[in-house]
Regions:
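Surface-exposed loop/turn motifs in large extracellular/passenger domains
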Residues: 1-9, 16-38, 47-67, 76-149, ...
Length: 190
């Protein structure tokens, strides 16, 4: 029964997970309440700047995650790439005998790279931050998810687009960075 009310990442670190240049492996399960915010370019939960996220959320949990600028709410930080084996982010959200996870994830805002002065898009709510890393997202059982995209990114997915889910119980609601509902017709509760 963990309760983490305000995990805040330092500069380029995730709220919970990896620091600058580091991937984060995080498991949140069974009667836990977590609120996490990434530092500049770090995921709320997952990888820091240039780091991937390997995140499992399971059972009766309440998770609120917000990415730092350009980073995912849950997933990777800015500038992350697939590992040597070609694997990107791995995110699993599922129900179990203790109950249903409720997840609110918001991608970080867009910004400007201070070194290159190039525009950086926002991060996905769940998935990949600004960068080339792919996201392997698995949702199982009954889930309640609200995901909001950062500017020029997706609510749930990676640079290849919104990930489609079928055959789930519960609800998935997706919003773009302007607050427009972009929930897919295949999402439960649509």
């Amino acid at each position: 029964n963990a309760k983490i009310e305000n995990a805040q990442g330092g500069f380029t670190g995730s709220g919970i997970g990896g620091g600058n240049g580091a991937s984060g492996t995080v498991t949140i399960k069974d009667d836990s309440t977590v609120t996490a915010t990434g530092g500049e370019a770090g995921a709320g939960i997952g990888g820091g700047y240039a780091g991937l996220g390997d995140v499992t959320i399971e059972g009766n949990t309440m998770v609120n995650a917000t990415g730092g600028a350009g980073a995912a709410g849950i997933g990777s930080g800015v500038g992350s790439v697939n590992d040597a084996a070609g694997n990107g982010n791995k995110i699993t959200i599922r129900s179990n005998e203790t109950g249903t996870p409720t997840v609110n994830a918001t991608g970080g805002k867009s910004g400007i790279d201070e070194e290159t002065e190039e525009k950086i898009p926002g991060g996905a709510g769940i998935g990949s931050g600004a960068g080339d890393a792919k996201a392997n997202i698995t949702l199982e059982g009954k889930v309640t998810i609200t995901a909001t995209a950062g500017k020029d990114n997706v609510a749930i997915g990676d640079k290849n687009g919104e990930q489609v889910f079928t055959g789930l119980d519960g609800s998935i609601t997706r919003y773009d960075s302007e607050g427009n509902d972009i929930t897919l017709p295949t999402d439960p509760g649509y």
